[in-house]
Amino acid sequence: MPLGERGGWERTESRYCGVETDFSNDVTHLLNFNISTGGFDYVLAPLVDPSYRPSLVEGNGVDTQVLPVCGSDLVLSPSQWSSHVVGKISSWIDLDSEDEVLRMDSETTLKQEIAWATHLSLQACLLPTPKGKSCANYARCVNQILQGLTTLQLWLRVPLVKSEGDSMDDTSEGLNDSWELWNSFRLLCEHDSKLSVALDVLSTLPSETSLGRWMGESVRAAILSTDAFLTNARGYPCLSKRHQKLIAGFFDHAAQVVICGKPVHNLQKPLDSSSEGTEKNPLRIYLDYVAYLFQKMESLSEQERIELGYRDFLQAPLQPLMDNLEAQTYETFERDSVKYIQYQRAVEKALVDRVPDEKASELTTVLMVVGAGRGPLVRASLQAAEETDRKLKVYAVEKNPNAVVTLHNLVKMEGWEDVVTIISCDMRFWNAPEQADILVSELLGSFGDNELSPECLDGAQRFLKPDGISIPSSYTSFIQPITASKLYNDVKAHKDLAHFETAYVVKLHSVAKLAPSQSVFTFTHPNFSTKVNNQRYKKLQFSLPSDAGSALVHGFAGYFDSVLYKDVHLGIEPTTATPNMFSWFPIFFPLRKPVEVHPDTPLEVHFWRCCGSSKVWYEWSVSSPTPSPMHNTNGRSYWVGL
């Protein structure tokens, strides 16, 4: 059964724990002992007798030899094979061996075992760790196999830290880091989404930053050795704080745990007292501890539960000028009370600065909400006036005729007819009867300016008095390089250029943030310069931490931070993000070809904001350590319409 219930999680979000076993001719007993008695969810078991070698069979001169598998497909039901067995490909295979017989035997065996696993309808098979300095032939053969697979997933076994006796660690610099081994193999297999990684977790762990890289990779399982466990005061197995944090991170990223190795904590009685004569699984105590770790993880918050379905799901950004928003979209944004509390605070400060206390009963402040939607900013502004005891006259300007209907009903229902004037018009083309003291808008996108706030406010600021206040007063975009294997494969699945040249709004989850974010473009309002130019260009350099090891950059995460007024800010940039706000997910700019980056070589990236007569678009490229093609030239794939 699954590891247990966790607060706020759906049943489909449960995690599972398997156990690695030796080869057995009696698969039924293997499942009974490890699943029915042991409590594990599945076995990671060899499918073929490890003594089998095709060349030895051929040498006997027998034409039709039966593959010495662990059991007929009939000994288990199809659902049992699929749900409770992960195939373990023979660990002796070495497709890059200089011994030609061994190499040929390895290739034949690999293909035979994968074919048998496919026949059994297994969900996954574990590939053994590459043994030499090169894995080119191994990867070539696996890539051939991947082309013919439909549902079977292949997990490549990779150690988190290589042991001293590991045959990989010859003098090859590229293999000093086990991530390099995985990256080399994955590149040779063309980033196939059916190829994932299973990490061997031993007693020694690399640095935190080195571990962090794996959170952006397609890790399907953590194979946890019994040697990694410590012993607590009562003699039971436990893990170090770092190991606990790592396993919790894998759980949070939907990876499974597999227990492997011999029991090193001899606490079990040979027979299960609850079932007389039944041998108890000696690895059960490790399963119990893993289940304990899962169940003690913090419950998901209400916001996290809502966002679960959006994790790593690519969405097209809004086109607010070209398209009118639907009621459901308005409803989602309006539920974000934190955002409107910040806007109310900003308006309160602006009103107090605009009108001194002694004139509060005399002066009426003219406030214009441009892009009023269904009225949340109108409400926040009127509440600010009430809190500060200031008189207010509001113009609510909205181009969406459907939202205007809701606005009229809101004004009538709240009795605001004498205070609020509704203007059904595009703010860029409206002629205001008077100038405003305060101009309020919520036109920001995930990247700040990506929903054309600069262009809209440039057109609207003619309403503003020379000493008027714009809320927001400024906003800045930020980017940071990320490893995002899932996002890259989702874009790649479209098999065209356009999707690699499109920016996506996405709730980032299975990503590794490789360096701190840096600012890109800043816009300030009001902007009374005689020649307004909203085109921008920025060159940035990012460096990986020295202890991180190399990493693969699949693209860039984008954020924004805005100053609403003075010290009131709003944003999603990770280090300054407004807590508990959900109106914006980050934006993702993919790279057509991922770039491998090393700690001693900076990543140099270029970003452009380009403006035409009818659209605005971004272009981006990498110039170091290896140049990438220019992305989205002339806005050929992705643009925002004016």
Swiss-Prot record:
Q: Which SUPFAM superfamilies match?
A: S-adenosyl-L-methionine-dependent methyltransferases (SSF53335)
InterPro entries of this UniProt entry?
A: Arg_MeTrfase (IPR025799), Arg_MeTrfase_PRMT5 (IPR007857), PRMT5 (IPR035075), PRMT5_C (IPR035248), PRMT5_TIM (IPR035247), SAM-dependent_MTases_sf (IPR029063)
Alphabetized, the UniProt keywords read: Chromatin regulator, Cytoplasm, Methyltransferase, S-adenosyl-L-methionine, Transcription, Transcription regulation, Transferase
Chief localization: cytoplasm
What does the record say about tissue specificity? Answer: Highly expressed in flowers, roots and siliques, lower expression in stems and mature leaves (at protein level). Abundant in shoot apex, young leaves and leaf primordia, floral and inflorescence meristems, gynoecium, stamens, sepals and young siliques, but not in older leaves, petals and vascular tissues.
Q: What GO CC annotations are associated with the protein?
A: cytoplasm
- The name this protein carries in UniProt is Protein arginine N-methyltransferase 1.5
